[in-house]
Amino acid sequence: MLTGCGSDSAANESSQASGSSVAETAAATTTEAAATTEAADKTEGGVLVFGTNAEFPPFEYVGDDGEPDGFDVALIKAVGEKLGMEVQVENMEFDSLVSSIGNRIDGAIAGMTVTDERKEQVDFSDAYYEAVQFVIVPADSEIAAADDLKNKTIGCQLGTTGMFLAEDIEGATAQTYNRAIDAVNDLVNGRVDAVIIDKNPAEVFNTKF
């Protein structure tokens, strides 16, 4: 049995890494709308390939049919429908999503925090979800506050906000994983002392262990 608590750090999460533009003045609205219509005419009937990491329920996970599913997948497919385009979603490692945009994939939608470093590489849409980081520990753990994480081994998914936070904790060792579920499995098996992850996936994992 696991338990979790929220951290004081919050980040704008789940921002799809496909560029979006907003008219800066009211006078530009008509021009912007015309440009959008023209772009839609050029893309209609095409295919958009988006990458995700289907290890982040309820936002993205592998469905019963073996294909990526979840809130983000439904969202990007709705965008594709609005544009008159087919959307294909590829499941890949989270840490490779940003570097794959522009070659292997057209964009990414994967519960991704907007950071200055990432903004130097890709464009982000407006943020549509604000997430709080949770710390998951065994029910009998002595860890009850943020200070208790000092000098502990903390599991986290590679390239995520949880990893960035774990790396900043005094004396702590950030044990990274390609899949969040692997971090939770190691927590259950006593290989790490805690896991830092977004609130919603933490709540899902808590129901499974």
Predicted regions and their residues:
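Short Pro/Gly-enriched coil loops immediately N-terminal to beta-strands
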Residues: 122-134
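Ligand-binding cleft/hinge of the Venus flytrap
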Residues: 60-64, 76-85, 161-179, 206-209
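Short helix-initiation/N-cap motifs at beta->coil->alpha
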Residues: 73, 89-100, 141, 158, ...
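Bacterial lipoprotein signal-peptidase II cleavage site
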Residues: 4-24
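Alpha-to-beta junction loops
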Residues: 84-86, 102-110, 153, 188-201
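A ligand-binding cleft/hinge motif common to bilobed small-molecule-binding domains
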Residues: 95-99, 112-121, 165-168, 193-209
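Flexible hinge/capping segments at coil-to-helix
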Residues: 137-154
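Extracytoplasmic small-molecule ligand-binding "clamshell" domains
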Residues: 41-112
